[in-house]
Amino acid sequence: MKLKTVAAAMLALALSAGAAAAQLAKSLKDQIVGTWDFVVAEVTAPDGKKSFPFGETPKGILIFTADGRFAQIHVASDVPRIASNNRLTGTPEEYAEIMRRSLSVFGTYTVDEANRTVTYNIVSASFPNWEGEAQTRAIDKLTTDEFVNTNRSVAGGRGSASNFYRRVK
């Protein structure tokens, strides 16, 4: 009986090690493909202070396709509703808060395996100033379940911004 238990444990260990090795053998681009839930965006100021532009419990998704396309939506969980219940008749204050607390971007992407970066080639965004830009992010962590990428120099010298994602199962 003990021999069967030991054999089963060894088989399980070998299979999990094999799965880990297979993941390591995949290119970063192959590993990144799929659908990711947005966990949090964390901005770290030069003095080390952290802030969360979409709050600490945001909603969102990031999708990478095998043919090099991406779509990203980040929304704070506490974005206020428009009082009129009509998206075309909100107040300037309502629109300003929505703009501050949400971001949608799509386009194409490339992965630089050697430098461990992903570059987003933005076709369109809810922040139109980004259209046509290529924005590169460091791939800080990429496992079967987690993806973290960081913009090391946020505009205006505000520090760095890291986005944390969990793979959708």
Q: PLM features: residue spans?
A:
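Bacterial N-terminal signal peptides that target proteins for export
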Residues: 1-10
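Lipid interaction determinants
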Residues: 8, 18-169
